[in-house]
């Protein structure tokens, strides 16, 4: 069951995982790639957060070039369903993005989220540099204290992110009355919005 309890860690002092400009301020944007089950679900969550500039659903972590949704669903490509998150680290640090990640899906179930089963639904963080890798490992350790079972989230370098087909983008926003959206995504998003109300976009 997805953990959506406990006190969010907003405001806790941590080192921000950002590059620095010549004047010492963080760069304008960063990107991190995350997989936590069906990308429709996790995309809907991150779309709501302050500081998130864009969320793209796609595929990564496997060996097949330019995979299709059908190929990824077959479980033969090695890819996971993921989202590529572009964010402003001056508004939301990577640490907070990663803490949300470990709260909005179950990182203790191997290759599964609820009824969605297969390696394409695995929990995964794909980093772009050493600072992101270190942040991911630290977030995983923080999250483990809140879960009774071992966290199985894979942490690996990003090779290539492939955008999913257009109809997958903003799927929940565009299809709120579709069956899966009503039964699975809507309750998840409602719980998330209640817990993180102070950090939602206006």
Label the model's feature ranges:
Residues 2-202:
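Flexible coil/turn and secondary-structure edge motifs
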């Amino acid at each position: 069951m997805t953990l959506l309890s406990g006190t969010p860690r907003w405001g806790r002092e941590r080192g921000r995982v950002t590059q620095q400009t010549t004047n010492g301020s963080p760069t304008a944007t960063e990107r991190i790639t995350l997989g936590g089950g069906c990308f429709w679900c996790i995309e809907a969550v991150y779309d709501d957060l302050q500081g998130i500039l864009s969320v793209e659903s796609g595929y990564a972590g496997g060996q097949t070039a330019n995979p299709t949704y059908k190929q990824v669903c077959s479980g033969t490509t090695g890819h996971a369903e993921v989202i590529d998150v572009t964010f402003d680290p001056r508004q939301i640090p990577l640490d907070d993005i990663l803490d949300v990640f470990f709260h909005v899906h179950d990182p203790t179930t191997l290759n599964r989220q609820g009824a969605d089963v297969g390696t394409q639904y695995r929990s995964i963080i794909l980093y772009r540099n050493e600072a992101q890798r270190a942040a991911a490992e630290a977030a995983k350790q923080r999250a483990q204290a809140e879960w009774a079972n071992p966290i199985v989230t894979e942490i690996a370098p990003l090779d290539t992110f492939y955008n999913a087909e257009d109809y997958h983008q903003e799927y929940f926003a565009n299809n709120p009355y579709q069956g899966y959206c009503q039964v699975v995504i809507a309750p998840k998003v409602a719980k998330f919005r209640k817990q993180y109300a102070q950090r939602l976009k206006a």
